[in-house]
A protein has these predicted regions:
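Charged, compositionally biased N-terminal leader segments and the immediate start
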Residues: 1-3
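Peripheral, non-catalytic segments that deliver or gate enzyme domains
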Residues: 5-12, 16-41, 45-68, 72-96, ...
Length: 346
């Protein structure tokens, strides 16, 4: 630029698989091992102290989804989690869907990016990374037989969203160099990955894309977001055409998140100067901004952070004077209260 030519003497290190780069890294590792050899007893001591403070046989709080209780647990002396579930009640026999300790055998690195279970509770899509590059290979497991389907979809975020037919799922691909999530594909179980349909592609390099299903399981949303702007598309989860329609076209500075309940979409948004955000709703049949109806107005002293929708309640996460608050409202208007916690700084 401006006649100033500069040489990057380290550009060759950009090729992570080049023999010279690998040799350099190996030499650096050997140098480190040599220079820190005298600290190995201390390293082991610190490791044991930190491990002693960890509950090795830990278990997550279970959550119920579509008739099953799902949870993650660890076993003492093992490094990786087990993803489990129980049918209808936590007293039912445990089903181990994924044992990452077994799956990690033979790999110097292993990470599973969660899982997504089909509507009939029989299939689970899951992503694994064995390189530590956050480029997950997506696969499908039959939870009844333990069989893995032959499809392997590479360079994904590792998560899939099932349609209602138990055969179709959507997934997100990454741009290979930058790892920006930029493409949404549709796959039909039992078909070649080469036949997958590109549903959406984001060309603006300042935006990432993702896909998720509404809590009601009736809609699938594609979201595109940058630092200051967001945009969503929606389709019925049961298809069959999966034509995604825009909720509200992106406008720089306009942010909104989306949920579904009944005949409406509910949006947490900063529209119309709502710097602390407000809650609006819009009919599913008319989603553009001119149809938005205010549910919770903007408040100068309260930041509206998020909402959670239940069959009988709307739960609102707020922050006032720097403290978190949880407001619970009945849909029928008969109750509206804040949860009382023992400490202000919960």
């Amino acid at each position: 630029m401006h006649g100033d030519v500069r040489t990057d003497d380290y550009y060759w290190m950009n090729e992570r698989d080049h023999p010279d780069v690998l040799a350099y890294l190996e030499a650096e590792n050997q140098y480190y091992e040599h220079m820190t050899a005298h600290t190995r007893p201390l390293q082991q001591q610190l490791f044991e102290e930190m491990k002693a403070r960890i509950k090795e046989d830990d278990e997550s709080v279970p959550f119920k989804y579509n008739g099953y209780w799902y949870y993650t647990r660890f076993e003492k002396g093992k490094n990786y989690p087990l993803y489990c579930r129980r049918n209808n009640t936590m007293l039912s026999p445990e089903e181990i869907m994924f044992d990452n300790n077994e799956m990690a055998i033979g790999h110097s690195y292993f990470k599973q990016a969660g899982y997504s279970v089909s509507e009939n509770n029989e299939l689970a899509a899951f992503g694994t990374d064995t390189v530590s590059r956050r480029q997950y290979t997506l696969q499908v497991k039959n939870l009844k037989t333990g069989e893995l389907y032959p499809e392997e979809i590479e360079n994904t975020t590792g998560r899939a969203i099932w349609a209602g037919d138990n055969e179709t799922f959507f997934y997100t691909r990454k741009e290979p160099q930058t790892l920006r999530s930029n493409q949404i594909y549709r796959h039909r179980l039992g078909t070649s990955v080469t036949e997958d349909v590109l549903v959406y592609e984001e060309f603006d390099e300042t935006f990432d894309v993702g896909i998720f299903k509404s809590k009601s399981r009736e809609f699938i949303f594609i979201g595109a977001s940058s630092t200051l702007t967001s945009e969503y598309r929606y389709s019925r989860a049961n298809g069959p055409d999966f034509n995604f329609e825009i909720v509200q076209e992106r406008t720089r500075g306009l942010e909104y998140g989306i949920s579904h309940f009944g005949d409406y979409f509910y949006l947490v948004t900063n529209a119309d100067g709502a710097t602390n955000f407000k809650l609006v709703k819009t009919p599913i049949s008319a989603t553009t901004k001119d149809n938005w109806e205010e549910v919770i107005p903007h408040r100068e002293d309260t930041l509206l952070e998020d909402i959670e929708i239940f069959e009988e309640f709307l739960v609102v996460e707020e922050r006032r004077e720097g403290l978190n608050q949880i407001n619970i409202k009945r849909w029928d208007g008969t109750d509206d209260y804040y949860l009382d916690f023992d400490s202000e700084t919960y």
